[in-house]
Amino acid sequence: MSWRVAGLVIAALALVKPARAQGWVVEPDGYRTEDYRSPVPETLAGARVLTTAEAEAIWRAKSGVFIDVLPRAPKPKGLPPNTVWRDKPRQDIPGSIWLPDTGYGILAGATESYLRQGLARASGGNMQALLVIYCLSDCWMSWNAAKRTLAYGYSDVAWYPEGTDGWARANLPVADAQPEPRPDDEK
Protein backbone atom coordinates (compact mmCIF):
# COMPACT_ATOMS: atom_id res chain seq x y z
CA MET A 1 0.00 0.00 0.00
CA SER A 2 1.38 3.39 -0.89
CA TRP A 3 1.98 6.04 1.76
CA ARG A 4 -0.70 8.22 0.18
CA VAL A 5 -3.36 5.53 0.47
CA ALA A 6 -2.28 4.76 4.04
CA GLY A 7 -2.51 8.47 4.86
CA LEU A 8 -6.03 8.66 3.43
CA VAL A 9 -7.14 5.62 5.44
CA ILE A 10 -5.75 7.12 8.64
CA ALA A 11 -7.43 10.47 7.90
CA ALA A 12 -10.75 8.74 7.24
CA LEU A 13 -10.53 6.80 10.50
CA ALA A 14 -9.73 10.02 12.36
CA LEU A 15 -12.98 11.50 11.06
CA VAL A 16 -15.06 8.45 12.04
CA LYS A 17 -13.85 8.31 15.64
CA PRO A 18 -14.98 11.87 16.57
CA ALA A 19 -18.42 11.19 15.07
CA ARG A 20 -18.84 8.23 17.42
CA ALA A 21 -17.50 10.24 20.35
CA GLN A 22 -20.09 12.94 19.65
CA GLY A 23 -22.88 10.37 20.05
CA TRP A 24 -23.75 9.81 16.40
CA VAL A 25 -26.27 6.97 16.43
CA VAL A 26 -27.47 4.85 13.53
CA GLU A 27 -31.23 4.73 13.04
CA PRO A 28 -32.35 1.16 13.85
CA ASP A 29 -34.76 -0.83 11.68
CA GLY A 30 -37.14 -1.60 14.53
CA TYR A 31 -38.03 0.00 17.85
CA ARG A 32 -35.57 0.64 20.66
CA THR A 33 -36.32 -1.68 23.59
CA GLU A 34 -33.66 -0.73 26.16
CA ASP A 35 -31.51 2.18 27.34
CA TYR A 36 -34.28 4.65 26.56
CA ARG A 37 -32.30 7.61 27.97
CA SER A 38 -29.30 7.53 25.68
CA PRO A 39 -28.19 9.34 22.52
CA VAL A 40 -30.73 9.16 19.70
CA PRO A 41 -30.27 9.25 15.92
CA GLU A 42 -30.43 12.51 14.03
CA THR A 43 -33.04 11.04 11.68
CA LEU A 44 -36.31 9.16 11.62
CA ALA A 45 -37.23 7.82 8.18
CA GLY A 46 -40.53 9.30 7.03
CA ALA A 47 -40.69 12.01 9.71
CA ARG A 48 -39.48 15.57 9.93
CA VAL A 49 -36.90 16.10 12.66
CA LEU A 50 -37.47 19.46 14.34
CA THR A 51 -35.11 21.89 15.99
CA THR A 52 -36.39 23.90 18.93
CA ALA A 53 -36.88 26.93 16.66
CA GLU A 54 -38.96 24.86 14.22
CA ALA A 55 -41.03 23.33 17.04
CA GLU A 56 -41.64 26.79 18.47
CA ALA A 57 -42.80 28.11 15.08
CA ILE A 58 -45.31 25.25 14.75
CA TRP A 59 -46.49 25.79 18.34
CA ARG A 60 -46.92 29.56 17.93
CA ALA A 61 -48.78 29.09 14.63
CA LYS A 62 -50.92 26.36 16.22
CA SER A 63 -50.33 24.37 13.04
CA GLY A 64 -49.65 21.03 14.72
CA VAL A 65 -50.68 18.95 17.72
CA PHE A 66 -47.95 18.32 20.28
CA ILE A 67 -47.91 14.87 21.87
CA ASP A 68 -45.81 14.16 24.95
CA VAL A 69 -44.93 10.49 25.48
CA LEU A 70 -42.89 10.71 28.70
CA PRO A 71 -43.61 7.63 30.82
CA ARG A 72 -45.32 7.89 34.19
CA ALA A 73 -45.22 5.46 37.07
CA PRO A 74 -48.74 4.17 37.68
CA LYS A 75 -50.42 4.27 41.05
CA PRO A 76 -50.05 0.75 42.41
CA LYS A 77 -53.34 -1.13 42.59
CA GLY A 78 -54.49 -2.38 45.97
CA LEU A 79 -52.84 0.26 48.15
CA PRO A 80 -54.26 0.46 51.68
CA PRO A 81 -57.07 3.07 51.88
CA ASN A 82 -55.05 5.69 53.81
CA THR A 83 -51.94 5.47 51.64
CA VAL A 84 -50.87 8.81 50.19
CA TRP A 85 -49.84 8.62 46.52
CA ARG A 86 -48.30 11.58 44.77
CA ASP A 87 -47.72 11.44 41.05
CA LYS A 88 -44.47 12.99 39.90
CA PRO A 89 -45.33 16.41 38.43
CA ARG A 90 -44.85 16.86 34.69
CA GLN A 91 -44.48 20.12 32.85
CA ASP A 92 -44.73 19.95 29.10
CA ILE A 93 -45.23 22.20 26.10
CA PRO A 94 -48.49 24.12 26.65
CA GLY A 95 -51.45 22.63 24.80
CA SER A 96 -49.83 19.21 24.50
CA ILE A 97 -51.62 15.93 24.85
CA TRP A 98 -49.77 13.63 27.24
CA LEU A 99 -49.92 9.94 26.34
CA PRO A 100 -47.53 8.40 28.88
CA ASP A 101 -45.85 5.04 28.38
CA THR A 102 -46.58 4.95 24.65
CA GLY A 103 -42.95 5.17 23.58
CA TYR A 104 -41.70 1.83 24.80
CA GLY A 105 -40.29 -0.49 22.15
CA ILE A 106 -42.91 -3.14 22.85
CA LEU A 107 -46.42 -2.06 23.82
CA ALA A 108 -49.05 -4.16 25.57
CA GLY A 109 -52.34 -4.33 23.69
CA ALA A 110 -54.08 -1.89 26.04
CA THR A 111 -51.24 0.64 25.74
CA GLU A 112 -51.19 0.37 21.96
CA SER A 113 -54.95 0.92 21.88
CA TYR A 114 -54.51 3.92 24.21
CA LEU A 115 -51.92 5.37 21.80
CA ARG A 116 -54.09 4.77 18.71
CA GLN A 117 -57.13 6.34 20.37
CA GLY A 118 -55.07 9.26 21.66
CA LEU A 119 -53.65 9.93 18.20
CA ALA A 120 -57.12 9.73 16.66
CA ARG A 121 -58.46 12.27 19.19
CA ALA A 122 -55.41 14.52 18.80
CA SER A 123 -55.67 14.53 15.02
CA GLY A 124 -59.46 14.73 14.91
CA GLY A 125 -59.29 11.56 12.81
CA ASN A 126 -57.26 13.36 10.13
CA MET A 127 -54.39 11.08 9.07
CA GLN A 128 -52.71 14.11 7.42
CA ALA A 129 -52.71 16.28 10.58
CA LEU A 130 -49.29 17.43 11.75
CA LEU A 131 -48.39 15.50 14.90
CA VAL A 132 -45.29 16.61 16.83
CA ILE A 133 -44.02 13.80 19.06
CA TYR A 134 -41.63 14.54 21.92
CA CYS A 135 -40.41 13.54 25.37
CA LEU A 136 -37.04 14.66 26.80
CA SER A 137 -33.67 15.05 25.11
CA ASP A 138 -31.86 11.78 24.44
CA CYS A 139 -35.11 9.89 24.92
CA TRP A 140 -35.90 6.98 22.64
CA MET A 141 -39.51 7.02 23.81
CA SER A 142 -40.32 9.89 21.44
CA TRP A 143 -38.40 8.27 18.58
CA ASN A 144 -40.30 4.99 19.06
CA ALA A 145 -43.67 6.74 19.35
CA ALA A 146 -43.06 8.85 16.24
CA LYS A 147 -41.98 5.75 14.28
CA ARG A 148 -45.09 3.91 15.48
CA THR A 149 -47.29 6.88 14.51
CA LEU A 150 -45.88 6.65 10.98
CA ALA A 151 -46.56 2.89 10.96
CA TYR A 152 -50.21 3.62 11.84
CA GLY A 153 -50.48 5.59 8.59
CA TYR A 154 -50.18 9.19 9.78
CA SER A 155 -48.42 11.09 7.01
CA ASP A 156 -47.28 14.33 8.67
CA VAL A 157 -45.27 13.24 11.68
CA ALA A 158 -42.61 15.45 13.22
CA TRP A 159 -40.18 14.26 15.87
CA TYR A 160 -38.83 16.84 18.30
CA PRO A 161 -35.80 15.07 19.84
CA GLU A 162 -34.86 17.87 22.26
CA GLY A 163 -38.27 17.64 23.92
CA THR A 164 -39.05 19.64 27.01
CA ASP A 165 -35.34 19.82 27.89
CA GLY A 166 -34.59 21.79 24.71
CA TRP A 167 -37.81 23.77 25.08
CA ALA A 168 -36.90 24.85 28.63
CA ARG A 169 -33.28 25.66 27.63
CA ALA A 170 -34.75 28.10 25.09
CA ASN A 171 -36.76 29.73 27.92
CA LEU A 172 -40.04 28.81 26.25
CA PRO A 173 -43.15 28.37 28.41
CA VAL A 174 -44.11 25.07 29.98
CA ALA A 175 -47.35 24.10 31.69
CA ASP A 176 -48.39 21.58 34.32
CA ALA A 177 -49.63 18.47 32.56
CA GLN A 178 -52.02 15.66 33.31
CA PRO A 179 -52.05 12.49 31.23
CA GLU A 180 -54.94 11.62 28.99
CA PRO A 181 -57.15 9.19 30.93
CA ARG A 182 -56.79 5.51 30.18
CA PRO A 183 -59.84 3.27 29.97
CA ASP A 184 -58.56 1.26 32.97
CA ASP A 185 -57.87 4.29 35.22
CA GLU A 186 -59.49 4.19 38.64
CA LYS A 187 -62.49 6.46 38.87
Which residue stretches match the model-derived regions?
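Positively charged n-region of N-terminal signal peptides that target proteins for export
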Residues: M1-R4
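Bacterial N-terminal signal peptides
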Residues: A6-K17
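Rhodanese-like catalytic fold shared by cysteine-dependent sulfurtransferases
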Residues: K17-A53, I58-A61, K77-V132, S137-K187
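Short hydrophobic beta-strand that contains or immediately precedes a catalytic carboxylate
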Residues: A55, V65-L70
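Surface-exposed acidic loop/strand-edge motifs in secreted or periplasmic proteins
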Residues: V69-A73, G78
